[in-house]
UniProtKB/Swiss-Prot annotation:
The keyword Transmembrane helix applies. InterPro entries: Na/sul_symport_CS, SLC13A/DASS. Disruption phenotype: Deficient mice display increased urinary excretion of citrate, alpha-ketoglutarate, fumarate, and malate and a modest increase in succinate. Despite the increased excretion, there is no significant change in plasma citrate concentration. No other phenotypic change is identified in these mice. Transporter deficiency do not affect renal function under normal physiological conditions, nor to response to renal injury. Highly expressed in kidney and small intestine. Not detectable in brain, heart, stomach and skeletal muscle. PROSITE patterns: NA_SULFATE. It comes from Mus musculus (Mouse). GO terms for molecular function: alpha-ketoglutarate transmembrane transporter activity; fumarate transmembrane transporter activity; sodium:dicarboxylate symporter activity; succinate transmembrane transporter activity. CDD domains: SLC13_permease. This is Solute carrier family 13 member 2. The keyword Amino-acid biosynthesis does not apply. Disulfide bonds: none annotated.
């Protein structure tokens, strides 16, 4: 019997893929409408995304097969959804991020900020969180976590070594950093945790160090997820939202762009980051704030040890190269162009220099990202000069460009590009089949629920759902439904879509919830219960912070207090009874 269950478990992915479509067949066979056919496709894809029986990107290709066969959309129209302006923004933004990562500019920024902030326990946590969050705004959460963790563990090793030396009356002879792999770090952590000590003070110190290492690990992975919400390109769900809004509401006049998103999400990120720092400090360092800020016994030696580790790593980077300076300049230029293209509170360069006959900008954030990334393929990584090829003496060799296609091809997550397209295809299929309207009609009773309560409940639901499945899949499934619901109850669509998009990044409780959590967990020293305990309250804090932001400073940015004309549908009751306000208190 045991062997039978083991065989079923081993082949579970194959069984799910084969049985799931058959199990769901009664829906399209009994209810033979386009709405039912589209619902069948969405439910099938949702379950495959949740179980990951197939790779996420492979499941995202299903609409190309199912929609034409079921008469929902023509194949040519479905395929157009897989490469839209949002996908271009994703590719361009990631190419710039790859250049930053390739030339180690992110590491220089991280170490420089840590040297400025200092290494007292509480400030060390804050420093790592600020740096990780800032980097995660521009490069992938996974890459940021993978880079910051080895730095954090090197500092922790030196802190532990310094503490032992202080207790034994020795000096710490060397602060030279020893690079170690995650496996080696895990072994050291495990050994440090299991070692038997002869005195209670030493055991207490070992326990304190272990708690501090847990806190630092969680600070890094949590701040990577939090930092990603601040910019439109910071994490993929943000781009999913922009793409869904542009697809479902084509007349929205580019309401979600880099500048408007930053004005909404950056303050939210800062507040959530500071609250997360306070919570993790209390949970892992205790409430002895005098000691946490480095005024306890022996803290000066520990501080010097940690500072020396960071200083050594920073020195090993050497002076900034020409490539780093060029990438820095282009990166700053990219951000400036993004902010000034269509800022909203004054005419941007996109509205004035590149406007069509209607006065609308003909360029997008994706145009800017591709422009900057193309420049990186042109500028050489060294100052042009006469240098010989070391392999062929006497033959001149030109330096490679700042960005090469090999580097991009190796580091670009092409699967996410397909996943984005699959989400846009689902949204378009829901609209074409009439499923969106059907769902909206069924959700009209929600108009009797206060809007702020609706946002709170939906954000909690998404935050729970994203713990079990990909945040991209979560937003892809929820956003079209939320858009239909908002139209049905005459609520500004962004009032529910924005908070639920941010809630999809609140994956704090489980190692499998998001790659940064998995990376931290694989380093060792953490149990699932540790992450769940820290992440549970942080999820609650996150949802409350998002609810605060959507009911305060977000209202003037997106004009959430009125139902927009671009959200009207032909059958909407809002045409007959236009609401004066969609937000409580306005």
């Amino acid at each position: 019997m045991a062997t039978c269950w083991q065989a079923l478990w081993a082949y579970r992915s194959y069984l799910i893929v084969l049985c799931l479509p058959i199990f769901l067949l009664p829906l399209p066979l009994i209810v033979q409408t386009k709405e039912a056919y589209c619902a069948y496709s969405i439910i099938l894809m949702a379950l495959l995304w949740c179980t990951e029986a197939l790779p996420l990107a492979v499941t995202a290709l299903f609409p190309i097969i199912l929609f034409p066969l079921m008469g929902i959309m023509e194949a040519s129209k479905v395929c157009l959804e897989y490469f839209k302006d949002t996908n271009i923004l994703f590719v361009g933004g990631l190419m710039v991020a790859i250049a930053v990562e390739h030339w180690n500019l992110h590491k220089r920024i991280a170490l420089g900020v840590l040297l400025i902030i200092g290494v007292r326990p509480a400030l060390l946590l804050l420093g790592f969180m600020l740096v990780t969050a800032f980097l995660s705004m521009w490069i992938s959460n996974t890459a940021t976590t993978a880079m910051m963790l080895p730095i954090g563990y090197a500092v922790l090793e030196q802190l532990q070594g310094s503490q032992k030396d202080v207790e034994e009356g020795n000096s710490n002879p060397s602060f030279e950093l020893q690079e170690a792999s995650p496996q080696k770090e895990e072994t050291k952590l495990d050994n440090g945790q299991a070692v038997s000590v002869s005195s209670e003070p030493r055991a207490q110190k070992t326990k304190e160090h272990h708690r501090f290492s847990q806190g630092l690990s969680l600070c890094i992975c949590y701040s990577a997820s939090i930092g990603g919400i601040a910019t439109l390109t910071g994490t993929t769900p943000n781009l999913v939202l922009q793409g869904q809004v542009n697809s479902i509401f084509p007349e929205n006049s580019n309401v979600v762009n880099f500048a408007s998103w930053f004005g909404f999400a950056f303050p939210t990120m800062v507040i959530l980051l500071l609250l997360a720092w306070l919570w993790l400090q209390v949970l892992f360092l205790g409430v002895n704030f005098r000691k946490n800020f480095g005024f306890g016994e022996g803290e000066e030696e520990r501080k010097q040890a940690a500072f020396q580790v960071i200083k050594t790593q920073h020195r090993l980077l050497g002076p900034m190269s020409f490539a780093e300076k060029a990438v820095t300049f282009l990166f700053v230029l990219l951000v400036v162009l993004w902010f000034t293209r269509e800022p909203g509170f004054f005419p941007g360069w996109g509205d004035t220099a590149f406007a069509n006959k209607k006065g609308q900008s003909m360029v997008s954030d994706g145009t800017v990202a591709i422009f900057i990334s193309l420049i990186m393929f042109i500028i050489p990584s060294k100052i042009p000069g006469l240098t010989e090829d070391p392999k062929k003496p006497g033959k001149l060799k030109a330096p490679p460009a700042i960005l090469t296609w090999k580097t991009v091809n190796d580091k670009m997550p092409w699967n996410i590009l397909i996943l984005l397209g699959g989400g846009f295809a689902l949204a378009k299929g829901s609209e074409e089949s009439g499923l969106s309207k059907w769902l909206g009609d069924k959700l009209t009773p929600l108009q009797h629920v206060p809007p702020s309560a609706t946002v709170l409940i939906l954000s909690l639901l998404v935050a729970i759902f994203t713990e079990c499945t990909s945040n991209v899949a979560t937003t892809t499934l929820f956003l079209p439904i939320l858009a239909s619901m908002a139209q049905a109850i005459c609520l500004h669509p962004l009032y529910v879509m924005l908070p639920c998009t941010l809630a999809a990044s609140l994956a704090f409780m489980l190692p499998v919830a998001t790659p940064p959590n998995a990376i931290v967990f694989s380093f060792g020293g953490l149990k699932v219960s540790d992450m769940a305990r820290a992440g549970f309250l942080l999820n609650i804090i996150g949802v409350l912070t998002i609810t605060l932001s959507i009911n305060s400073w977000s209202i003037p940015i997106f004009k959430l207090d009125t139902f927009p004309t671009w959200a009207y549908s032909n059958t909407s009751q809002c045409l007959l009874n236009p609401p004066n306000s969609t937000v409580p208190g306005h």
